[in-house]
């Protein structure tokens, strides 16, 4: 689905206090504005956070989105609780964005990826900041998991990690190569099937390799107790980085479903606890009948909303981010998104783009995948 930038110039009013009331509202609105060409006004930014308003990494997302479409923006400053964003056409090209210290590169990348992937032209992004930081998908989650599911939908790009950036030093760098011209397909994922494989990564940066080995041993011990018939494979790596940090990431591959969970190290946090964090999250997913983990369910909503037809999948858990993202998407697109389950429980998610788009809207049609 592509929407001409000349159409639908009515300003969309977005309440930043909706749903979980955090940065998700802002990032979703920015992506949708780039995709549809529709301007928006966002008020009460991050109203439910201890420090409301734009923080540095949120401002970086606004400025990055504005740069790729030459947008006119008002209110783009630290602490601002309201912005107005009027986009121009998305311009493929080479861009560099410095998020600052340990600001999450993944969140800015996810804001820009789909608009650039659907644009007619090649783009390259370089983002500097945090690559493995709390409250955001780490780089390896994006590369091992998110990227592959988007490719299954017909959205193609490549990622590379030049330097890891852990909290609080940051200083990492991620590069994305986006060929452009992607046309998202619909997706049917209702039955996860049987577990085929568990792969993992235990990595350290500027810390003894033995810490990564301890993380690996604990994860393998726990996984073999939980899943006696499984043969997990976890590799150990030392990542180049400015600061210090650790990560333990697990990817479960099922017949049709897929889930990725990870734990991050922190001062005073034992290596075994990092592994337990990832294993506990993966075990919770495997106890459900979900086809995707709760984080991916949230991240797939927008690509599915831009797809050519109805999609359905099952999440292992309904999260506030999922419901918030759905609410913002409904403001910009004539679409039905049904989440058939309560907060915190597994649920079916159905995404139905409009069968008859409004005047000026063009929908590109392709087949679905299952």
Where are these regions (language model features)?
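N-terminal glycine-rich anion-binding loops that anchor highly charged ligand groups
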Residues: 23-43, 53-54
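A generic, well-ordered mixed alpha/beta core segment in the N-terminal half of proteins
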Residues: 59-160, 175
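Flexible, glycine/charged-enriched surface loops at secondary-structure junctions
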Residues: 72-76, 122-123, 156-164, 223-242, ...
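Beta-rich nucleic-acid/ligand-interaction surfaces
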Residues: 134-137, 161-175, 235-244
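Conserved mixed alpha/beta catalytic, RNA-binding, or beta-rich assembly cores of soluble enzyme
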Residues: 135, 185, 191-294, 312
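Internal helix-turn-beta structural module
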Residues: 303-370
């Amino acid at each position: 689905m592509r929407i001409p930038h000349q159409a639908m110039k009515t300003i969309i009013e977005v309440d930043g206090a909706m749903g979980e009331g955090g940065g998700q509202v802002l990032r979703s609105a920015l992506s949708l504005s780039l995709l549809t060409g529709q301007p928006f006004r966002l008020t009460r930014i991050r109203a439910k956070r201890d420090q409301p308003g734009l923080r540095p990494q949120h401002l970086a997302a606004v400025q990055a989105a504005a740069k790729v479409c030459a947008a006119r923006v008002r209110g783009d400053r630290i602490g601002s609780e309201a912005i107005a964003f009027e986009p121009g056409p998305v311009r493929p090209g080479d861009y560099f964005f410095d998020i600052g210290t340990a600001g999450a590169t993944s969140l800015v990348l996810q804001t820009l990826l789909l608009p650039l992937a659907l644009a007619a032209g090649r783009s390259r992004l370089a983002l500097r900041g945090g690559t493995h930081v709390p409250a955001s998908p780490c780089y390896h989650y994006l590369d091992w998991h998110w990227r592959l599911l988007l490719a299954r939908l017909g959205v193609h790009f490549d990622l590379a990690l030049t330097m890891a950036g852990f909290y609080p030093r940051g200083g990492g760098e991620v590069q994305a190569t986006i060929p452009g011209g992607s046309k998202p397909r619909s997706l049917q994922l209702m039955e996860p099937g049987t577990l085929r494989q568990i792969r993992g990564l235990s990595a350290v940066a500027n810390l003894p390799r033995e810490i990564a080995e301890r993380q690996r041993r604990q994860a393998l011990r726990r996984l073999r107790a939980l899943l006696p018939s499984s043969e997990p494979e976890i590799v150990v790596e030392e990542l180049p980085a400015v600061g210090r940090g650790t990560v333990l990431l697990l990817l479960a591959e099922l017949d049709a479903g897929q889930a990725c969970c990870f734990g991050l190290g922190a001062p005073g946090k034992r290596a075994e606890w990092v592994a337990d964090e990832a294993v506990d999250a993966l075990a919770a997913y495997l106890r459900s009948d979900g086809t995707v983990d709760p984080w991916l369910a949230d991240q797939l909503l927008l690509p599915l909303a831009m797809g050519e037809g109805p999609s359905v999948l099952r999440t292992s858990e309904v999260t506030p981010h999922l419901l918030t993202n759905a609410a913002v998407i409904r403001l910009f697109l004539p679409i039905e998104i049904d989440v058939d389950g309560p907060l915190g429980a597994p649920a079916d998610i159905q995404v139905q783009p409009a069968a008859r788009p409004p005047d000026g809207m063009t929908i590109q049609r392709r087949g679905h995948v299952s």
